Amino acid sequence: MGKNKLEKFADMASYPHVFEYPYSAVDNVPFDMKGKWHKEFFKNDNPIVLELGCGRGEYTVGLGRMFPDKNFIAVDIKGARMWTGATESFQTGMKNVAFLRTNIEIIDRFFAEGEVSEIWLTFSDPQMKKATKRLTSTYFMERYRKFLVSNGIIHLKTDSNFMFTYTKYMIEENGLPVEFITEDLYHSDLVDDILGIKTYYEQQWLDRGLSIKYIKFLLPQEGELREPDIEIELDSYRSYNRSKRSGLQTSK
């Protein structure tokens, strides 16, 4: 029999590689690990990579296995979902993986300047109604700048044509360097080990015949960031665990 939510929450609270700081607690509880992830937790100087909106955490666990010379931190607010990856990494003794349960809106409170090298955004909610909630919006780019190294790498992997198109326009509007871009990752010319990692939800979308889009771009520290002023056609389908789209056909 699988564990219920309360049992999963109890496990999460006991795991040494899980840090739980929901929005309601952050103002009252100082986060001592900020600026000390390398020294105090990972105990090495390997690059730190974040996965924001990690869901079950399978992608972080997969990356951790694939790249033992990097440190990975999976971030999400849903503790019961994160339990899957947190439990697997704990039981297998992985030392280069951690989990942070918090709201991504306050992610800059947990890392010091230049402490993070890369960010993965895997199947983020496209937030078609409000640009500032999109994890590739300039609102979030400014937050990432507070802790990402200059020209740090950002990976977007998505089934959403809306999210992919919006991110392309955001990149173009701000002249951000693009290292790779494709509208169909598994039929592209990209040769990379990351192709071997598929999350539970990603496989569902592939089974439904949806193509997976991918962008790898850099975020310089300098330069004012501007939001793209363009209407984008909304996704015509309802992705797993996303709220139903509105009656609108386009959005900025």
Swiss-Prot record:
Gene Ontology CC terms: tRNA methyltransferase complex
Active-site residues, record numbering mapped to chain: 125
Residues that coordinate or bind S-adenosyl-L-methionine: 51, 76, 103, 125
Name of the top EC class for this enzyme: transferase
EC number: 2.1.1.33
Reaction catalysed by this enzyme: guanosine(46) in tRNA + S-adenosyl-L-methionine = N(7)-methylguanosine(46) in tRNA + S-adenosyl-L-homocysteine
Identification of the protein by name: tRNA (guanine-N(7)-)-methyltransferase
InterPro entries: SAM-dependent_MTases_sf, tRNA_(Gua-N-7)_MeTrfase_Trmb, tRNA_methyltr_TrmB_bact
PANTHER family: 3-DEOXY-D-MANNO-OCTULOSONIC-ACID TRANSFERASE/TRNA GUANINE-N 7 - -METHYLTRANSFERASE, PENTACOTRIPEPTIDE-REPEAT REGION OF PRORP DOMAIN-CONTAINING PROTEIN
Assigned keywords, A-Z: Methyltransferase, S-adenosyl-L-methionine, Transferase, tRNA processing
GO terms for MF: tRNA (guanine(46)-N7)-methyltransferase activity
Similarity field: Belongs to the class I-like SAM-binding methyltransferase superfamily. TrmB family.
Superkingdom to which the source organism belongs: Bacteria
Matching Pfam families: Methyltransf_4
HAMAP family reported in the protein's UniProt record: tRNA_methyltr_TrmB
Binding site for substrate: 129, 159, 199-202
Gene3D superfamilies attached to this UniProt entry: Vaccinia Virus protein VP39
Keyword S-adenosyl-L-methionine: yes
UniProt function note: Catalyzes the formation of N(7)-methylguanine at position 46 (m7G46) in tRNA.
